[in-house]
């Protein structure tokens, strides 16, 4: 079993901060509810209730939606509510048996947050009221050992841990925004009932859109069928062999090639001797989305949880049916850019559910979930990643619970290999990547700072690449990298019009950095860097790729973890051959 390192400790710290903030917000809401009930009571009744204190108690409950073989208990502070009266009045039961009648809410209640505060377990987002459906409709959840089901306005959160969880982060009043990150406020301005909103009695705060922050935005019209010009997209044409000849990097001799073969065989034997179960951390989180969820809600769920993909659960088939990734959302954005139904792409995305939207766009998708099992050795699991050209491979416990235990990645496999190897093949790891011929050098695609964002999105979709370097048109030096992970940052906006996608890509990323502290994306290496140093840098920075540059910071190539893993598991591919 591999024990998690700094990455899990950092995530735990983030979750603890969220829990503290949510606990404070719940206390504030409870006090406001108590004050509201006092204002509705007659004076004599208020005195009889003992100052109008509402009863709060610890209640050990077993959720009715939990599988019959599972018993999960949680301690929660609750206030008894009864909404069955004919006048739509809210009736609160007090500790002395009195009923407090409150007028019906005139303000629409916000949807719950997508994120559960629990760190450990499987989080399933399952919509029961995406289209305003009410009632006691039972949801079929993915089978787990222990399921904790929290019923809220629009969806269920199913968490396999028995830890108490709060998930009303998004339902707090913005009067308390002085102690809250303003970026966690209103996500969408759509009037739909399933829209996540934040309400206030005085004013409504909306995160500014890209167009409102642009000083040079002249694309105010709705560009339905804009012709996409690729004139600002270029390709690095000089191959690695020519670059090595110019810089004096030596070719691999027969003795070095022997060390390479021996080192690669050591790595292969190590991976064949360990299973996926060995890589699964002690604690972790897997987010699962129901196929009935609205596309917009799925988009928000990925951003809220800081992930790039999630398995899809079909409640009718009682099985996992695939993955939804940021690549899918790129195709969705491009679809609504060309065929907008309104001036807000996010509003358009709320129309379709995940299960029906793929019929609207002609995108090739796997017919079933590509997965592996805990008993599969890491060599076979890595081969699946490389064969299907995917970045994430779910590890499914098909024998017992049919639940997803972990999402395996190139980074996780390489990190486990580097940390757990008893004796690393240092001779192989000390060879420069330029000599090994790892990476893409002859066909590196780059864009300019003024390239429209929509052209970059089309490039990522057409070329099936995960990132593209951004080059300054004056200096020809790299200034940034646009990756697929940047796509989810768009969900932080309240409105995204089709014309916003016409903005220059560098301007968009600068806005993201100013508003939402977008993490640094430029991680580089050179052809002279050793293979071991490159692997360590990717793992430490938690990035999938490095941009290979020369001494003047001009792009020469791209080196990804997929390239490294493919090189280690296959025949020698030096530039001599």
Curated annotation (Swiss-Prot):
Keyword Lipid biosynthesis applies: yes
Superkingdom per UniProt: Eukaryota
Domain CBS: 279-341, 364-426, 438-499, 517-574
Cross-referenced Pfam families: CBS
Region (Disordered): 45-226
Keywords: CBS domain, Fatty acid biosynthesis, Fatty acid metabolism, Lipid biosynthesis, Lipid metabolism, Repeat
GO cellular component, one term: nucleus
UniProt feature, compositional bias: Polar residues: 106-121, 138-155
GO molecular-function term, one example from the UniProt record: protein kinase regulator activity
Cross-referenced InterPro entries: AMPK_gamma/SDS23_families (IPR050511), CBS_dom (IPR000644), CBS_dom_sf (IPR046342)
Biased composition (Low complexity): 58-88, 165-226
GO biological process entries: cellular response to glucose starvation; fatty acid biosynthetic process; positive regulation of gluconeogenesis; regulation of carbon utilization; regulation of glycolytic process
Keyword Phosphoprotein: no
Family: Belongs to the 5'-AMP-activated protein kinase gamma subunit family.
Primary role: AMPK may be responsible for the regulation of fatty acid synthesis by phosphorylation of acetyl-CoA carboxylase.
Protein name: 5'-AMP-activated protein kinase subunit gamma
Organism: Dictyostelium discoideum (Social amoeba)
């Amino acid at each position: 079993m591999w024990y998690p390192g700094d990455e899990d400790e950092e995530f735990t710290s983030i979750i603890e901060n969220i829990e503290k903030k949510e606990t404070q917000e719940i206390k504030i809401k409870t006090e406001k509810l108590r004050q509201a009930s006092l204002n509705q009571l007659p004076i004599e009744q208020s005195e009889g209730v003992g100052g109008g204190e509402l009863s709060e108690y610890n209640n050990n409950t077993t959720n009715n939606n939990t599988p019959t073989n599972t018993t999960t208990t949680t301690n929660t502070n609750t206030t008894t509510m009864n909404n069955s009266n004919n006048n739509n009045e809210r009736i609160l039961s007090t500790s002395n048996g009195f009923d407090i009648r409150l007028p019906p809410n005139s303000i629409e209640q916000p949807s719950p947050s997508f994120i559960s505060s629990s760190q450990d377990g499987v989080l399933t987002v399952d919509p029961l009221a995406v289209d305003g459906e009410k009632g006691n409709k039972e949801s079929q959840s993915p089978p787990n050992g222990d399921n904790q089901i929290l019923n809220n306005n629009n969806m269920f959160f199913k968490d396999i841990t028995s830890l108490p969880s709060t998930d009303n982060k998004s339902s707090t009043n913005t009067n308390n925004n002085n102690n809250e990150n303003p970026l966690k406020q209103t996500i969408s301005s759509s009037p739909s009932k399933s829209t996540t909103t934040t309400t206030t009695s005085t004013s409504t705060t909306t995160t500014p859109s890209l167009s409102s922050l642009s000083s040079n935005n002249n694309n105010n019209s709705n560009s339905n069928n804009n012709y996409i010009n690729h004139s600002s997209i270029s390709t690095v044409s000089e191959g690695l062999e020519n670059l090595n000849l110019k810089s004096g990097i030596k070719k691999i001799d027969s003795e070095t090639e022997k060390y390479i073969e021996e080192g690669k065989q050591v790595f292969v034997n190590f991976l064949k001797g360990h299973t996926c179960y060995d890589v699964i951390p002690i604690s972790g989180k897997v987010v699962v989305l129901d196929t009935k969820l609205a596309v917009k809600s799925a988009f928000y769920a990925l951003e809220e949880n800081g992930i790039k993909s999630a398995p899809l659960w079909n409640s009718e088939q009682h099985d996992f049916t695939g993955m939804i990734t940021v690549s899918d959302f790129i195709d969705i954005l491009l679809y609504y850019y060309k065929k907008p139904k309104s001036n807000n792409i996010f509003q358009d995305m709320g129309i379709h559910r995940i299960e029906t939207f793929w019929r609207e766009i002609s995108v090739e998708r796997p017919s079933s979930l590509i997965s592996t099992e805990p008993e599969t050795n890491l060599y076979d699991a890595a081969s699946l990643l490389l064969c299907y050209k995917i970045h994430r491979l779910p590890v499914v416990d098909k024998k017992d619970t049919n639940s997803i235990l972990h999402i395996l990645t190139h980074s996780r496999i390489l990190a486990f290999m580097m940390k757990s190897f008893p004796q690393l093949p240092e001779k192989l790891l000390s060879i420069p990547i330029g000599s090994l011929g790892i990476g893409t050098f002859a066909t590196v695609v780059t864009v300019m700072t003024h390239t429209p964002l929509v052209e970059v999105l089309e490039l990522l979709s057409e070329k099936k690449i995960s990132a593209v370097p951004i080059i300054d048109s004056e200096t020809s030096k790299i200034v940034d990298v646009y990756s697929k992970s940047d796509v989810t940052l768009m969900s932080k906006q309240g409105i995204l019009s089709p014309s916003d996608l016409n903005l220059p890509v560098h301007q968009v990323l600068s806005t993201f950095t100013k508003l939402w502290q977008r993490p640094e994306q430029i991680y580089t290496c050179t052809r002279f860097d050793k293979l071991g140093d490159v692997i360590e840098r990717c793992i430490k920075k938690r990035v999938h790729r490095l941009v290979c540059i020369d001494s003047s910071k001009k792009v020469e190539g791209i080196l990804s973890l997929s390239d490294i893993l493919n090189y280690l598991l296959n025949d020698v591919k030096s530039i001599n051959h």
